[in-house]
């Protein structure tokens, strides 16, 4: 089960959730409660205008019929050093 945290150092710059392949069937993202702004989950082009918005403490859970590579997910944030925790269900 891939588990980790992603910190966005520079707002407007998407950060990869994983750098090596992890086949998953589900994944949960949770914005840290101590974040000062929203974070966004999406693909490599994620931004505040097209990502799934998570306010501090919000959680997003996605399930898939087929396996998907965790490297497809990226995170961006409104505020530098805000973070997202994630946990994937390995295939």
Each model region followed by its residue ranges:
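Surface-exposed ligand/attachment interfaces on beta-rich extracellular proteins
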Residues: 2-23, 80
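Short proline/glycine-enriched turn/loop motifs at strand-loop junctions of beta-rich domains
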Residues: 22-24, 31-37, 81
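Noncatalytic modules at the cell exterior or secretory-pathway interfaces
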Residues: 25-27, 65-82
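Beta-strand-rich, repetitive solenoid scaffolds
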Residues: 30, 41-42, 54, 63-65, ...
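Exposed low-complexity, polar/acidic, P/S/T/G-rich flexible segments that act as propeptides
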Residues: 81-91
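Short, surface-exposed beta-strand/strand-loop-strand elements in extracellular ectodomains
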Residues: 32-50, 85-87
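Short, solvent-exposed S/T- and G/P-enriched segments that are highly enriched in secreted/extracellular
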Residues: 8-16, 49-66
């Amino acid at each position: 089960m891939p588990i980790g945290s992603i910190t966005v150092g520079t707002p407007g710059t998407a950060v990869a959730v994983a750098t090596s392949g992890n086949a998953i069937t589900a994944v949960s993202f949770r914005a840290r409660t101590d974040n000062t702004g929203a974070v966004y989950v999406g693909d490599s082009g994620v931004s505040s205008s097209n990502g799934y918005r998570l306010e501090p403490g919000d959680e997003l859970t996605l399930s898939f019929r087929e396996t998907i590579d965790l490297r497809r997910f990226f995170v961006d944030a409104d505020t530098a050093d805000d973070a997202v925790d994630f946990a994937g269900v390995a295939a």
